[in-house]
Amino acid sequence: MDLRDRFTEMREMDLQVQNAMDQLEQRASEFFMNAKKNKPEWREEQMASIKKDYYKALEDADEKVQLANQIYDLVDRHLRKLDQELAKFKMELEADNAGITEILERRSLELDTPSQPVNNHHAHSHTPVEKRKYNPTSHHTTTDHIPEKKFKSEALLSTLTSDASKENTLGCRNNNSTASSNNAYNVNSSQPLGSYNIGSLSSGTGAGAITMAAAQAVQATAQMREGRRTSSLKASYEAFKNNDFQLGKEFSMARETVGYSSSSALMTTLTQNASSSAADSRSGRKSKNNNKSSSQQSSSSSSSSSLSSCSSSSTVVQEISQQTTVVPESDSNSQVDWTYDPNEPRYCICNQVSYGEMVGCDNQDCPIEWFHYGCVGLTEAPKGKWYCPQCTAAMKRRGSRHK
């Protein structure tokens, strides 16, 4: 709202200066046409009046330039604030899962670039048309990609939500290469910790909440117009901020139930295998019973080793997740300590915040008013009145004009 009002004021001042300049040019041309016919007193009076109006237009133009500088500072301050919030949100996402911001930005760029048709070269090769000339067929072709982009974004959202539900239900899965084909269970190998993907996040760090936040970010990105969509991560940041308690609860529950769910699933499988093998051994001969008991012991030993490896891997995942969540927070705290508030007012010709010793300009209409000693070449407090270099140059210029 403030920016729009300042732009409106700047536009009004610009129109006022332009109208004044047009009128002064017309008066000057009439003055030179009628100068020889009139008396010297009339010529002096008209000349002084025209010069006075020119100086007034010049002051209005200077005020317009100062207003433009204020608008530039305001926009720059807001941009720095947005960049800091975006960097902070990226650090929070990286703390939960490393590499997710790069994946989201890459997918956003893929959505920004529409896919080119295959037969584009063959369709337009026989009609030599200039690049800047309007072509209705090509315009129609570009508009046809909007539903395709929408379909891609919807498919991406459905994939993210389905992956989140799968990751919440599945436990820790390891590959048991020594198990035979007669065993009742097969454990699939889990993906290594070094490879990160939205669909295959580590369940020990609350994959469901992270994937849902990523889905919300992609949805907010898809709803925006084509252009710069990096700042659309603000939508998922608001989702984290509004649902902080629920997300924290989900993270803690996910960490606590990983080891228990995997171990309970393996124990129930072991008991079922033991009972089935015992029933088969009763109906067979004694030699077969001995063979089955030995095979059962080997399978139980392999399953117990897989259970211990599953529990150890879950503890390793929790330790890694705790380390990744602690270290970036300390880095962010150290970064915040060295940065200043973007809303803090700026002073001096260097456009920086207040620090050290500063001197004030005695001109009441000075737009800056306060200056650092080093920027204006002072080492101690000046005696008497002191004016900044800009005000001094403006006063000298006005004095020379009045002479």
Swiss-Prot record:
The keyword Nucleus applies. Keywords: Acetylation, Chromatin regulator, Growth regulation, Isopeptide bond, Metal-binding, Nucleus, Transcription, Transcription regulation, Ubl conjugation, Zinc, Zinc-finger. There is a cross-link at K133, K150, K152, K241 (Glycyl lysine isopeptide (Lys-Gly) (interchain with G-Cter in SUMO2)). A zinc finger (PHD-type) spans 345-394. It is found in: Nucleus. Transmembrane segments: none annotated. The modification N6-acetyllysine is found at K166, K249. InterPro entries: ING3_PHD, ING_fam, ING_N_histone-binding, Zinc_finger_PHD-type_CS, Znf_FYVE_PHD, Znf_PHD, Znf_PHD-finger, Znf_RING/FYVE/PHD. The keyword Metal-binding applies. Gene3D superfamilies: 6.10.140.1740, Zinc/RING finger domain, C3HC4 (zinc finger). Disulfide bonds: none annotated. PROSITE patterns: ZF_PHD_1 (PS01359), ZF_PHD_2 (PS50016). Zn(2+) 2 binds at C361, C366, C388, C391. GO terms for molecular function: methylated histone binding; zinc ion binding. Zn(2+) 1 binds at C348, C350, H372, C375. Residues 290-310 have a biased composition (Low complexity). GO terms for cellular component: NuA4 histone acetyltransferase complex; piccolo histone acetyltransferase complex; Swr1 complex. Residues 112-149, 271-310 are annotated as: Disordered. Interacts with H3K4me3 and to a lesser extent with H3K4me2. Component of the NuA4 histone acetyltransferase complex which contains the catalytic subunit KAT5/TIP60 and the subunits EP400, TRRAP/PAF400, BRD8/SMAP, EPC1, DMAP1/DNMAP1, RUVBL1/TIP49, RUVBL2, ING3, actin, ACTL6A/BAF53A, MORF4L1/MRG15, MORF4L2/MRGX, MRGBP, YEATS4/GAS41, VPS72/YL1 and MEAF6. The NuA4 complex interacts with MYC. HTATTIP/TIP60, EPC1, and ING3 together constitute a minimal HAT complex termed Piccolo NuA4. Component of a SWR1-like complex. The PHD-type zinc finger mediates the binding to H3K4me3. Belongs to the ING family. Component of the NuA4 histone acetyltransferase (HAT) complex which is involved in transcriptional activation of select genes principally by acetylation of nucleosomal histones H4 and H2A. This modification may both alter nucleosome - DNA interactions and promote interaction of the modified histones with other proteins which positively regulate transcription. This is Inhibitor of growth protein 3. It comes from Pongo abelii.
